[in-house]
A protein has these predicted regions:
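Acidic, Mg2+-coordinating catalytic module of metal-dependent nucleases/exonucleases
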Residues: 85-91, 97, 128-196
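Conserved non-catalytic scaffold segment of RNase H-like nuclease domains
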Residues: 2-100, 134, 140-146
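Short alpha-helix plus adjacent loop in nuclease-associated cores
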Residues: 109-134
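Active-site donor-binding loop signature of nucleotide-sugar glycosyltransferases
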Residues: 41-43, 109-111, 149
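Short coil/loop linkers at secondary-structure junctions
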Residues: 58, 104, 150-151
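Substrate-recognition/cap helix-loop segment adjacent to the acidic, metal-dependent catalytic center
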Residues: 92-114
Length: 196
Protein backbone atom coordinates (compact mmCIF):
# COMPACT_ATOMS: atom_id res chain seq x y z
CA UNK A 1 0.00 0.00 0.00
CA UNK A 2 1.23 3.48 -0.87
CA UNK A 3 1.96 5.66 2.15
CA UNK A 4 0.15 8.99 1.83
CA UNK A 5 -0.02 12.34 3.57
CA UNK A 6 -2.25 15.38 3.16
CA UNK A 7 -1.61 19.10 2.84
CA UNK A 8 -4.33 21.24 4.41
CA UNK A 9 -5.16 24.92 3.97
CA UNK A 10 -7.98 26.96 5.46
CA UNK A 11 -9.30 30.41 4.73
CA UNK A 12 -11.18 32.36 7.40
CA UNK A 13 -13.91 34.99 7.36
CA UNK A 14 -14.04 38.37 9.10
CA UNK A 15 -15.06 36.58 12.33
CA UNK A 16 -11.98 34.32 12.21
CA UNK A 17 -14.17 31.30 11.40
CA UNK A 18 -13.17 28.75 8.75
CA UNK A 19 -15.03 29.52 5.53
CA UNK A 20 -13.16 27.11 3.24
CA UNK A 21 -10.94 24.04 3.53
CA UNK A 22 -8.66 22.65 0.84
CA UNK A 23 -6.95 19.28 1.19
CA UNK A 24 -4.51 17.61 -1.20
CA UNK A 25 -3.45 13.99 -0.70
CA UNK A 26 0.02 13.06 -1.97
CA UNK A 27 2.21 9.99 -2.22
CA UNK A 28 4.68 10.10 0.69
CA UNK A 29 7.56 8.79 -1.42
CA UNK A 30 7.17 10.88 -4.59
CA UNK A 31 5.25 13.78 -3.03
CA UNK A 32 3.05 13.80 -6.13
CA UNK A 33 -0.60 14.83 -5.83
CA UNK A 34 -3.03 11.91 -5.86
CA UNK A 35 -6.37 13.57 -5.06
CA UNK A 36 -7.90 16.70 -3.57
CA UNK A 37 -11.05 17.99 -1.88
CA UNK A 38 -12.40 21.51 -1.55
CA UNK A 39 -15.14 22.52 0.86
CA UNK A 40 -16.83 25.87 1.31
CA UNK A 41 -18.35 26.09 4.77
CA UNK A 42 -21.88 27.44 5.09
CA UNK A 43 -23.12 29.69 6.57
CA UNK A 44 -19.61 30.96 7.53
CA UNK A 45 -18.62 31.90 3.97
CA UNK A 46 -21.59 34.29 3.78
CA UNK A 47 -19.99 36.51 6.46
CA UNK A 48 -17.33 37.44 3.93
CA UNK A 49 -13.62 37.78 4.36
CA UNK A 50 -10.51 39.28 2.87
CA UNK A 51 -10.36 36.53 0.22
CA UNK A 52 -14.06 35.82 -0.35
CA UNK A 53 -13.64 36.59 -4.04
CA UNK A 54 -11.36 33.54 -4.32
CA UNK A 55 -13.91 31.01 -3.02
CA UNK A 56 -15.03 30.05 -6.55
CA UNK A 57 -18.44 28.76 -5.53
CA UNK A 58 -19.28 27.44 -8.99
CA UNK A 59 -15.97 25.67 -9.62
CA UNK A 60 -15.61 22.00 -10.46
CA UNK A 61 -15.38 19.71 -7.45
CA UNK A 62 -16.62 22.33 -4.98
CA UNK A 63 -18.55 20.97 -2.00
CA UNK A 64 -20.68 23.42 -0.01
CA UNK A 65 -21.54 22.03 3.41
CA UNK A 66 -21.95 22.90 7.06
CA UNK A 67 -18.75 22.60 9.08
CA UNK A 68 -19.65 19.37 10.88
CA UNK A 69 -20.59 17.60 7.65
CA UNK A 70 -17.52 18.89 5.78
CA UNK A 71 -15.12 17.81 8.52
CA UNK A 72 -16.80 14.41 8.79
CA UNK A 73 -16.57 13.84 5.01
CA UNK A 74 -12.96 15.00 4.82
CA UNK A 75 -12.08 12.84 7.84
CA UNK A 76 -13.70 9.78 6.27
CA UNK A 77 -11.85 10.45 3.00
CA UNK A 78 -8.55 10.79 4.90
CA UNK A 79 -9.26 7.56 6.78
CA UNK A 80 -10.16 5.72 3.55
CA UNK A 81 -6.79 6.82 2.16
CA UNK A 82 -4.98 5.83 5.39
CA UNK A 83 -3.74 9.40 5.89
CA UNK A 84 -2.46 10.10 9.40
CA UNK A 85 -0.08 13.01 8.69
CA UNK A 86 -1.34 16.50 7.90
CA UNK A 87 1.03 19.18 6.61
CA UNK A 88 0.32 22.89 6.42
CA UNK A 89 2.23 26.13 6.02
CA UNK A 90 2.16 27.77 9.45
CA UNK A 91 0.39 24.62 10.62
CA UNK A 92 -0.52 25.93 14.06
CA UNK A 93 -2.97 28.35 12.37
CA UNK A 94 -4.81 25.60 10.50
CA UNK A 95 -4.60 23.14 13.39
CA UNK A 96 -6.04 25.71 15.80
CA UNK A 97 -8.90 26.40 13.39
CA UNK A 98 -9.57 22.66 12.96
CA UNK A 99 -9.52 21.32 16.54
CA UNK A 100 -11.59 18.35 15.35
CA UNK A 101 -8.40 17.15 13.60
CA UNK A 102 -6.15 17.42 16.65
CA UNK A 103 -5.87 13.62 16.62
CA UNK A 104 -3.86 13.68 13.40
CA UNK A 105 -0.10 14.29 13.41
CA UNK A 106 0.46 17.86 12.17
CA UNK A 107 3.67 19.10 10.51
CA UNK A 108 4.64 22.68 9.69
CA UNK A 109 6.12 23.13 6.21
CA UNK A 110 7.27 26.63 7.17
CA UNK A 111 9.65 25.18 9.77
CA UNK A 112 11.78 23.90 6.91
CA UNK A 113 10.98 26.47 4.22
CA UNK A 114 12.02 29.47 6.34
CA UNK A 115 15.40 28.05 7.41
CA UNK A 116 18.65 28.28 5.47
CA UNK A 117 19.62 24.77 6.63
CA UNK A 118 16.64 23.28 4.77
CA UNK A 119 15.97 25.78 1.99
CA UNK A 120 18.91 26.01 -0.41
CA UNK A 121 17.19 28.88 -2.25
CA UNK A 122 17.78 31.26 0.68
CA UNK A 123 20.71 33.39 -0.42
CA UNK A 124 23.85 33.92 1.62
CA UNK A 125 22.97 37.61 1.83
CA UNK A 126 19.41 37.07 3.09
CA UNK A 127 18.66 38.63 6.47
CA UNK A 128 18.47 35.66 8.85
CA UNK A 129 18.61 35.09 12.59
CA UNK A 130 21.56 33.14 14.01
CA UNK A 131 19.33 30.06 13.87
CA UNK A 132 19.21 30.37 10.07
CA UNK A 133 15.55 31.47 9.95
CA UNK A 134 14.63 34.30 7.65
CA UNK A 135 13.70 37.47 9.54
CA UNK A 136 10.99 38.29 6.99
CA UNK A 137 9.72 37.21 3.61
CA UNK A 138 8.97 33.59 4.46
CA UNK A 139 5.26 33.44 3.62
CA UNK A 140 3.95 31.02 1.02
CA UNK A 141 4.15 33.52 -1.84
CA UNK A 142 7.69 34.71 -1.06
CA UNK A 143 9.03 31.20 -0.52
CA UNK A 144 7.42 29.75 -3.64
CA UNK A 145 8.80 32.64 -5.71
CA UNK A 146 12.22 32.00 -4.20
CA UNK A 147 12.17 28.24 -4.79
CA UNK A 148 10.58 28.28 -8.25
CA UNK A 149 12.38 31.42 -9.43
CA UNK A 150 9.00 32.55 -10.79
CA UNK A 151 8.51 36.16 -9.71
CA UNK A 152 5.12 36.25 -11.46
CA UNK A 153 3.62 33.76 -8.99
CA UNK A 154 0.88 35.19 -6.77
CA UNK A 155 -0.79 33.29 -3.94
CA UNK A 156 -4.49 32.92 -4.70
CA UNK A 157 -5.85 32.51 -1.15
CA UNK A 158 -8.15 29.78 -2.41
CA UNK A 159 -7.79 26.93 0.09
CA UNK A 160 -7.43 24.02 -2.34
CA UNK A 161 -5.13 25.91 -4.73
CA UNK A 162 -3.02 27.08 -1.80
CA UNK A 163 -2.79 23.51 -0.46
CA UNK A 164 -1.45 22.53 -3.89
CA UNK A 165 1.07 25.39 -3.74
CA UNK A 166 2.19 24.27 -0.29
CA UNK A 167 2.73 20.76 -1.66
CA UNK A 168 4.79 22.36 -4.45
CA UNK A 169 6.97 24.02 -1.79
CA UNK A 170 7.58 20.61 -0.23
CA UNK A 171 8.50 19.19 -3.64
CA UNK A 172 10.90 22.05 -4.40
CA UNK A 173 12.54 21.83 -0.96
CA UNK A 174 13.34 18.24 -1.89
CA UNK A 175 13.27 16.70 1.58
CA UNK A 176 11.82 13.32 2.38
CA UNK A 177 8.79 13.17 4.64
CA UNK A 178 10.91 11.94 7.57
CA UNK A 179 12.85 15.23 7.55
CA UNK A 180 9.63 16.94 8.69
CA UNK A 181 9.83 15.07 12.00
CA UNK A 182 11.54 18.23 13.28
CA UNK A 183 8.42 20.19 12.29
CA UNK A 184 5.80 18.31 14.31
CA UNK A 185 3.26 20.69 15.80
CA UNK A 186 1.51 18.48 18.42
CA UNK A 187 -1.13 15.81 18.78
CA UNK A 188 -1.34 12.11 18.13
CA UNK A 189 -3.97 10.14 16.28
CA UNK A 190 -5.84 7.61 18.37
CA UNK A 191 -6.37 4.13 16.98
CA UNK A 192 -9.51 3.58 14.97
CA UNK A 193 -11.61 6.05 13.05
CA UNK A 194 -13.11 9.01 14.87
CA UNK A 195 -15.78 9.16 12.14
CA UNK A 196 -17.48 5.82 12.90
Amino acid sequence: MTEKFAVVDTETNWNDEVMSIGVVIADAKTQQKMDSRYYIITPEYRVGGMYSSELRLDGEGVHIAERKQALREIGQWLDTNHVRKLFAYNASFDRNHLPEYAGYQWYDIMRLAAYRQYNRAISDTADCYKTGRLRCGYGVEAVLKMLSKDNRYSETHNAVLDAGDELRIMQLLGHGISTYDIAVVTGKRTSGSIWE
